[in-house]
């Protein structure tokens, strides 16, 4: 019983840490035409590679929702759905496909996640702002944001073996 409680506490703390990082990176962005470029995709993709799909949704979806709620509330529901789905797909691909080739599974996951993020935000912006032109204006920057998040998370996970480190932490 105590072992299960300790594992649940560790899982909760690791998930909360990644969610806090997501919220912090949602608080500022690089100015670009039509808005800002945010770096929280790095945390969303990295956490999704490391954590299970439930924790990935909490970090990606709920973390982005809270970040938007605090700093820029207009797209907060788009962020909840888009980043939540993005994180779940990345996590599922990283943990349940190509088990003998985890790097390939992670690359597949972040690639699918990038597509989900770009499509979700493009459709969401067109709906929220009532103009597809605004969504198209932001499209190249959404692609750049998704690419930066995907590539950086793969590099972080490969170079520093973050999945192995966090799996050891979560097993204790």
What are these regions (language model features)?
Residues 1-172:
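Loop-helix junctions at membrane interfaces
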């Amino acid at each position: 019983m105590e072992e299960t409680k300790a594992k649940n506490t560790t899982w909760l703390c690791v998930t909360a840490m990644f969610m806090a990082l997501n919220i912090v990176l949602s608080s500022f962005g690089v100015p670009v035409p039509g808005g800002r470029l945010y770096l929280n995709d790095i945390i969303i993709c990295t956490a999704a590679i490391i954590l299970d799909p439930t924790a990935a949704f909490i970090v990606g979806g709920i973390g982005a929702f809270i970040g938007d709620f605090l700093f820029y509330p207009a797209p907060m529901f788009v962020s909840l759905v888009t980043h939540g789905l993005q994180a779940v797909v990345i996590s599922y691909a990283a943990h349940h496909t190509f088990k003998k080739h985890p790097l390939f599974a992670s690359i597949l996951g972040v690639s699918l996640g990038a597509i989900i993020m770009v499509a979700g935000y493009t459709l969401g912006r067109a709906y929220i702002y009532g103009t597809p032109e605004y969504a198209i204006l932001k499209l190249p920057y959404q692609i750049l944001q998704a690419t930066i998040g995907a590539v950086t998370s793969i590099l972080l996970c490969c170079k520093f073996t973050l999945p192995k480190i966090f799996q050891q932490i979560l097993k204790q």
